[in-house]
A protein has these predicted regions:
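A structural signal for multi-pass alpha-helical bundles of membrane permease subunits
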Residues: 1-187
Length: 187
């Protein structure tokens, strides 16, 4: 990510970011069949690993877009000072860039988690066993059309499902705001 912001020319960087954002405009429903067939071929259908890989692939352009703003505004002087002190690129990244980018990483991770937590269609299509169902599919499957659902249990489960991202957002609110704003200002 840092290499995209630092070493790629402005025109190429804009083209790459536009291509990433364009992939986010493709409806997920239109690519579910190829994802399904790919996971079936890899024998990852109906597994949590398959869901994690799918959500990771679907949310990666969004996360890259969020982090690019931070890395674009990252001061090159810090990297140059580390190079003068004898740090390799890897050590510069692990000792300087990564610790300073934790807020942005938390912000991107929080957005990705909430997007995958609240998604329904991917979990419904790619899983059939109850063990691999995400919470949104569990709640939907509990609405049995044959018998009267237990509304108290369903409401309690819905509240718990809504509390997880709410508590996470509350706990990480300052970190997420710092991460969102860290790449927002120029200069």
């Amino acid at each position: 990510m840092g290499s995209l912001s630092r070493f790629v020319g402005r025109r190429a960087r804009r083209t790459l970011l536009l291509a990433l954002l364009t992939t986010r405009m493709i409806p997920v429903v239109s690519i579910l069949i190829p994802i399904y067939l790919g996971l079936q071929r890899l024998q990852l259908l109906n597994t949590r690993t398959g869901l994690i890989l799918t959500y990771g692939g679907l949310l990666l352009p969004f996360v890259i877009w969020i982090l690019e703003g931070f890395y674009r505004g990252f001061p090159a002087e810090l990297e140059e000072a580390a190079a003068i002190d004898g740090c390799s690129r890897l050590r510069t990244f692990t000792r300087i860039v990564l610790p300073l980018s934790t807020n942005s990483l938390f912000a991107a991770g929080a957005f990705a988690f909430i997007a995958s937590w609240s998604d329904f269609i991917v979990g419904l299509v790619l899983t059939t066993s109850e063990a691999a169902w995400p919470i949104s599919v569990v709640l939907a499957q509990s609405l049995n059309p044959i018998s009267e659902p237990s509304w108290g249990l369903l409401n309690s489960a819905g509240l718990i499902a809504a509390l997880v991202p709410a508590v996470m957002a509350f706990v990480l609110r300052r970190t997420v705001m710092r991460g969102m704003l860290s790449g927002a200002l120029k200069g």
